[in-house]
């Protein structure tokens, strides 16, 4: 008889546990008020998510712009550095050019045989200076007789009527012009031919 009582207790306990589990897992019947609260909560969360997504997109755009600005800055600094290396000695070269001009004039006017040693020394010095300048990218402007006058490289000191030369060509050069790495350092001072006036 005791066995029977023990079996009945087990069954009743099992039924109680089952009822408790069903009660815990059963979904409560939604009420209209809880549905409205849930919809409002979902709407708030969606709005917050949209705001955060917009903020993230704006931040990403800002990062991309900053990265582009930094890259442009690097390129500009690199270009300025290259220009500084290329043209940094411009003022020094401009100071040396008059000495070269004077040596060239001295050679043009040297005609005395007794000065041949001095003339030879000047030629050697001039040659060394020109060679050194060439190493640093200095080249003379082409301003020989018959060359077409180019205001980008030549400065006209006067105009000469000439039937022997084409109009707008160089007749003579007063002072050499120079380029530094293909950029004008000093224009050539020249005399330019014009067509003779008809009488």
UniProtKB/Swiss-Prot annotation:
The cross-references to CDD domains, in alphabetical order and at most eight, read: GrpE (cd00446)
Biased composition annotated in UniProt, kind: Polar residues: 24-36
Q: What cellular-component terms does GO give this entry?
A: cytosol
Work out whether the entry's keyword set contains RNA-binding.
no
Biological processes per GO annotation: protein folding
Domain of life the protein comes from: Bacteria
Protein keywords: Chaperone, Cytoplasm, Stress response
Region described as Disordered: 1-40
Where does this one sit in the cell?
Cytoplasm
List GO molecular-function terms, semicolon-separated. adenyl-nucleotide exchange factor activity; protein homodimerization activity; protein-folding chaperone binding; unfolded protein binding
PANTHER family the record matches: GRPE PROTEIN, GRPE PROTEIN HOMOLOG, MITOCHONDRIAL
Task: Indicate the quaternary assembly.
Answer: Homodimer.
Question: Which family is this protein grouped under?
Answer: Belongs to the GrpE family.
Function summary: Participates actively in the response to hyperosmotic and heat shock by preventing the aggregation of stress-denatured proteins, in association with DnaK and GrpE. It is the nucleotide exchange factor for DnaK and may function as a thermosensor. Unfolded proteins bind initially to DnaJ; upon interaction with the DnaJ-bound protein, DnaK hydrolyzes its bound ATP, resulting in the formation of a stable complex. GrpE releases ADP from DnaK; ATP binding to DnaK triggers the release of the substrate protein, thus completing the reaction cycle.
Protein name according to UniProt: Protein GrpE
Species this chain originates from: Geotalea uraniireducens (strain Rf4) (Geobacter uraniireducens)
Lineage runs: Bacteria, Pseudomonadati, Thermodesulfobacteriota, Desulfuromonadia, Geobacterales
Gene name? grpE
């Amino acid at each position: 008889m005791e066995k029977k009582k023990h079996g009945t207790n087990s069954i009743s306990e099992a039924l109680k546990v089952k009822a408790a589990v069903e009660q815990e897992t059963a979904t409560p019947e939604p009420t209209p008020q809880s549905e409205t609260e849930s919809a409002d909560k979902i709407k708030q969360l969606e709005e917050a998510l949209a705001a955060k997504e917009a903020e993230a997109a704006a931040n990403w755009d800002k990062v991309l712009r900053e990265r582009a600005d930094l890259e442009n800055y690097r390129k500009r600094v690199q270009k300025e550095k290259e220009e500084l290396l290329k043209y940094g000695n411009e003022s020094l070269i401009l100071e040396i050019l008059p000495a070269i001009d004077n040596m060239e004039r001295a050679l043009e006017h040297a005609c005395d045989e007794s000065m041949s040693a001095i003339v030879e020394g000047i030629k050697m010095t001039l040659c060394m200076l020109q060679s050194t300048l060439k190493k640093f990218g200095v080249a003379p402007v082409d301003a020989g007789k018959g060359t077409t006058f180019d205001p980008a490289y030549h400065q006209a000191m006067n105009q000469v009527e000439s039937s022997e030369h084409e109009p707008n060509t160089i007749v003579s050069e007063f002072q050499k012009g120079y380029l530094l790495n293909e950029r004008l350092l000093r224009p050539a001072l020249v005399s330019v031919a014009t067509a003779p006036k008809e009488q």
